[in-house]
């Protein structure tokens, strides 16, 4: 069975919402849309207080090379433009819009009819992705159009589509593939045209039998797209691991996938590409799994960007004794520090964890068992890196590859002594990165 070669773990899957169809979340009374909800430089606000905007209208422009346009997810009046705390607690510029109906920009095709023929040229597709503010929906939120600005000396041999969804609990991709498989295929065809790659490989874990069967059937009409079942193993969906599993190519340290002739996108991104290329619809909504062991009805909602997280949780119901709410999955997600914040691109899951699940085991001394080393998918030695970080020996951290850590959490998950290994390594990466930055000034 196809998989990456080193390490990996298999946490409890807990895909409680996999059978819950995607529903439209009620339109909120107001939205707060952050201008910096992507990797790179925040977009520059192009509206002012008092302006009336329509759904799909650009309200902030990504003017830097690595940036993305931001659009209104609703129609209404701009009432405030000011710093607003996001779920991490950090303040970012937010545009508050009082909702007045649901009027869409006239240039957007809002019909449910599937548009199959791709009429845009390669460059027009890339330009459309930029115009519509499409970013990677797998979590990183890297502006998609930048990936397809391929240097003239590079060639793309493979377009890889990450449909692994290896994080526990999250089922957004699962539902997208069941309910919007053809739109995803058309989006992938558009990306093939933009990249010049001869083939696209969809990597999907073999625990999704129903999805694999459905995708394989739909893919029969798309000869350049292959569905590739993979072994169920975390972090199968990590970029470098996916590349190794599907192509047997290795991305060198500090390099990007294009160096080995590969571009990687998420299946959710493929759906956003379809909307942009075929419907001229910007990225203004996200499909979010709302789940947890104590959640009465785990669900998948299509939610307008900028919707209040508090409103979403109140609508679903916060279980008693909830100790932590995470954006993303339990392995790589981030805890919400501020519940009075608003959704943004790439927030694929709201996970409510019971107090009993949040308690860490008592930390004891390292027993030198080496399990953290055996599960590291990057071939690092967490057993060495943690004490180096504790001793603030960041030069040695760098020499031992700390910057190659993807922060997947496998080492900490596997540690029988309950040591906060990945927490220390994350800190060490931050300090080491600052040292490297200062050195290169």
Tell me the role of every PLM-derived stretch:
Residues 1-46:
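N-terminal, Lys/Arg-enriched amphipathic/low-complexity engagement segments
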